[in-house]
Structures are given as C-alpha cells and as structure tokens.
Amino acid sequence: MDIFISKKMRNFILLAQTNNIARAAEKIHMTASPFGKSIAALEEQIGYTLFTRKDNNISLNKAGQELYQKLFPVYQRLSAIDNEIHNSGRRSREIVIGIDNTYPTIIFDQLISLGDKYEGVTAQPVEFSENGVIDNLFDRQLDFIISPQHVSARVQELENLTISELPPLRLGFLVSRRYEERQEQELLQELPWLQMRFQNRANFEAMIDANMRPCGINPTIIYRPYSFMAKISAVERGHFLTVIPHFAWRLVNPATLKYFDAPHRPMYMQEYLYSIRNHRYTATMLQHIAEDRDGTSH
C-alpha cells in the first residue's frame, strides 16, 4: 500500500512507462475506464495535456516528458521510503501474501480480502515471474505468493523454496435462468463467454482447450474489463454465459442465475502457494484460504 505516493502520481508514472491505459491499469488491478479518468483529471488539474493520444496509442508529449523526468526520481525516493516503512513495520506482526494479479477478478478479490478478514495478514497484488518469486521470498519482502502459474524445474529445484499445491479450484458456468429449458452443451456452444480481461493471462485458454475441445465445443470468448457484478448483470440479461469458481455461486441470486459444470466432468484450476522452506505459517495460510472459500471464516 502506498503511504506517501499519491494515486495521481502513481498512475501517471505507470502510464508513462507502459504507453497503454489497459496495461497500466492491470498492473494495479484497476479497469481501464477509471484509470483513464484519473489521468484526465490530473491533466485538468494542472491545466495542460501530458499525453498525445492517437487511435489506441498514447505517449508522453513534450510537457509530459519534462514532468516525468522531474517526477520519476521523486517517485523512486518515495517508493523506497514506503517500502522501508512497510517492511520494518510489519516484520514483527504480519504475514504478507502476494496475490498473482493474473487471477480471474472474483478469485483475486477473494484472495486480496484475506488481509481484511484475518488479523496479522496483509495481502497485496504482485506481478508473477520466476525471478519475482525468488527475489520476493528470499529477500523476505513477502512471506507467501499464491498463483495459478507453476514455475519451471529450475526454480522448483531450489533448496530453500517450498511449493504447496492447493486443492484444485472447481470452476463452472453461470447462465441466465431464462435458458432453463435449453441443453447446457448447446448453450456452451451458442452463447459467447464473457470473461474478465485478466483471465487470458492465467492459463485460461489452456484450461478451456483441455475441457471443451474433446467435447466438440469451440467457444467464443470475449474479454472485457468488467467488475464481477457488471459481468453478472450482463449474464442475467441473457447476453452471455461466464466461468466462475464454484465458491462464488453463493454470491449471486439463484432465482435469476443457474450454475452448471462442464460436460462429462467439472473443470478444475490448479493453484500453488510459494514460500521459504519450513515457514511456520504455511499450514495457517492454507487453512485461511480454505476456510474463506468454504464460507466458514470468522
């Protein structure tokens, strides 16, 4: 969590470095629309534009480049101070878990909320990479990292790294009750699937291939940066179906929506909890995740 860095400063730096609103927004698990509005609000506040916009491209203009050169060293210093305070303040009292930001949004939101539900736990988004796993865990920046992505054999063989497999996460489909009388396999083929933007980076397509292609189903998958509730609303209206984790079924209205599994057998997504070997809170963290998904957390 940023302490001294303002949201406008952070968003400006991210956009300057990525030249893409959607990618910049993904890094902090925002959707593109509010991120773009924050940049427009910044430009309005200072009284001049910072970016050149052409079609889908965006880049710093001359004024933006000058501001970036002045601001980036300040941003780096403040970021270092934020990290120092965060790390020193939490070492004695908190477990910090990094949540892979490629998770489907509803799963990401459930995991990030562990920090609100369990005393002594802080959850924060991370951009998953093999080097990031090594650096964050071995340098004690994070106690745990949870991800649907598996590291290579090179990293698996590190002596001080532990990889705990979580119970496979059951995934199914949500569709409007107006299709109550239709065959589920027909709906999977005919209705477009509406998914969050982040899911196409979390081995989602590979999972779909493994489960759908053998059934002869070739879905049309549409990725949109919707919130969970916006996605559910679109499904309720009958325009789409969508994939959700089974634990999220209790969060929607069963009078208007129907849950069903994939043909022949349910789909499952594997997850991994990374930590330093013999971390004393590994079992505790695994229990927190399981309880929260079962709906038995305190």
Curated annotation (Swiss-Prot):
InterPro entries: LTTR, LysR_subst-bd, Tscrpt_reg_HTH_LysR, WH-like_DNA-bd_sf, WH_DNA-bd_sf
Regions recorded as binding DNA: 21-40
Keywords: DNA-binding, Transcription, Transcription regulation
Pfam families linked: HTH_1, LysR_substrate
Disulfide bonds: none
Residues of the HTH lysR-type domain: 1-61
CDD domains per the UniProt record, alphabetical: PBP2_LTTR_substrate (cd05466)
Protein family according to the UniProt entry: Belongs to the LysR transcriptional regulatory family.
Record's protein name: Uncharacterized HTH-type transcriptional regulator YgfI
Organism listed in the record: Escherichia coli (strain K12)
